[in-house]
Amino acid sequence: VRAATVVLATGAVETPRILFNSADDKDPNGLGNHHDQLGRGLQDNPKVVLSTSLYKLWGSRLDYDIGYGDLLILMSREKLPDGSEFPFIGHAIHGIPDYPHYLGQMALIPPAIKEKLARHLFYSYVTLGLFCAGERLSENRVKPGHSHDRYGVRQVDIDFSTTQNTHEQMDAMMRWGTRVLKKA
């Protein structure tokens, strides 16, 4: 198979950048952009992440296999202030922190006690990552920029805003996650 043109798709920002910079006499707006739709409708999924130490697991000395694929998948629905519902999904991760960063925030606790406390809390962490469908807004877009990278290739600018509905969805997922963690 031979192709006259090959386009490497690399993601939501780099793909439009490649295509915008492919402009020539035949395609003045870049390959695949005859109708000026390239880069429009950029969206992201509203998401929240909650993490805590579960009191019930303090002091546990279980030997966890923290391999990949051990996530608990979560699905639920929540209500928005206008009474409408939206679905969301996520995952619960019961993992061990790579480094107990929380110890740095415990300035008032003596070092000898910090170490014992860290051992006590080590296996008790859980994280919830929740997300829902994003909204496609035409004005959210990747567009040709005015600056160039070190190779002289034109960069892109990104126009992105979120709606009140998106913020309400994130607030609702945060409330749901907080309720779940308080009951755990």
Question: Residue locations for each model-derived region?
Answer:
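Glycine-rich loop(s) and the adjacent beta-strand/alpha-helix scaffold that form part
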Residues: 1-65
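FAD-dependent oxidoreductase catalytic-site/capping-region signature
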Residues: 53-61, 68-184
